A protein has these predicted regions:
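Short helix-capping/linker segments at secondary-structure and domain boundaries
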Residues: 10-17, 130, 227-232
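Catalytic cores of large soluble enzymes that bind and process phosphate-bearing ligands
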Residues: 10, 54, 58, 208, ...
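Polybasic low-complexity intrinsically disordered regions
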Residues: 16, 20-23, 32-37, 41-175, ...
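Helix-centered, glycine/charged polyanion-binding patches within enzymatic domains
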Residues: 156-157, 162-242
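Alpha-helical support elements that line or immediately flank enzyme active sites
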Residues: 2-12
Length: 250
């Protein structure tokens, strides 16, 4: 059933679509370990299994298990982290059983644009861009408010955009014993660079920070563009968080 769930996530299918897909596609059946004579799980069975995974937050556990395997294989060699956050929009329609919008979703602003939904906070390593941790909250949370949850104590350097300016001075980081050894390579606000030439040393330093930090944007591109998860699928942050964590594993 777990393989069926991963297939459903990878191909962005509803429960009925997944049931039909297993009937029609022999390769999918083989991947799921189903012989031709085996009974194919119907949509209610697929739904119940997904609810079981959500109840025990197994999406997060699977992500941690995969990361442990990557670390033990020596693929994450750096103690640097890149942090960033991105909005996941929530449907504005009230055409549902309660005739209300999801109470866990909220509105947040980026630049001059308002977003209604939730926010995905992510940390990756600074060499390959592998997701090392992720937390989720309402859209009105500031990016920096969840940064401490993303960064392990042994982290030596942290990259982030201008939304994380002053991160190292926050109380939750000051109580960290390793904070004194850590460097925070945070991009300056755009206005600071105004009027500086392309050859200016400060601008070159900022360009280097951005060239490292762009790796975390690939995570958002995969989730929101390749996997088409621009909008929430379910009501509540926890259910959507489970699906996004599973997407990162896939």
């Amino acid at each position: 059933m777990l393989r069926i769930h991963l297939l459903q996530i990878a191909y962005n299918m509803s429960d009925p679509q997944m049931g039909d897909f297993l009937h029609e596609n022999s390769t999918a059946r083989k991947f799921a370990g189903l012989a031709l004579a085996d009974r194919t799980p119907d949509e209610s069975t697929i739904l119940q299994f997904r609810h079981l995974l959500e109840k025990h937050d197994l999406g997060k556990q699977v992500l941690e298990l995969v990361n442990d395997g990557i670390t033990s294989a020596g693929l994450v060699l750096s103690k640097g982290r890149i942090v960033d956050a991105s909005f996941i929009e929530a449907p504005s329609s009230t055409k549902n059983r309660d005739h209300k919008r999801d109470p866990e979703m909220s509105s947040g602003k980026k630049g001059n644009t308002w977003h209604v939904g939730m926010k995905m906070h992510v940390a990756t390593d600074d060499i390959i861009g592998i997701v090392t941790s992720a937390v989720y909250g309402p859209a009105n949370e500031h990016d920096i408010s969840r940064a401490r949850e993303l960064i392990p104590s042994e982290t030596e350097q942290v990259y982030g955009d201008a939304g994380y300016v002053g991160m190292g001075k926050r109380e939750e980081f000051q109580t960290d014993k390793e904070a004194e050894k850590r460097s925070y390579r945070i991009n300056l606000r755009p206005g600071v660079l105004k009027g500086r030439s392309a050859e200016d040393l400060i601008r070159k330093i900022e360009h280097f920070k951005s060239s490292v930090r762009c790796k975390v944007e690939h995570v958002f591109a995969r989730v929101k563009l390749q996997m088409s998860y621009r909008k929430t699928r379910y009501r509540g942050i926890a259910k959507n968080a489970h699906r996004i964590n599973t997407l990162k594993v896939v």
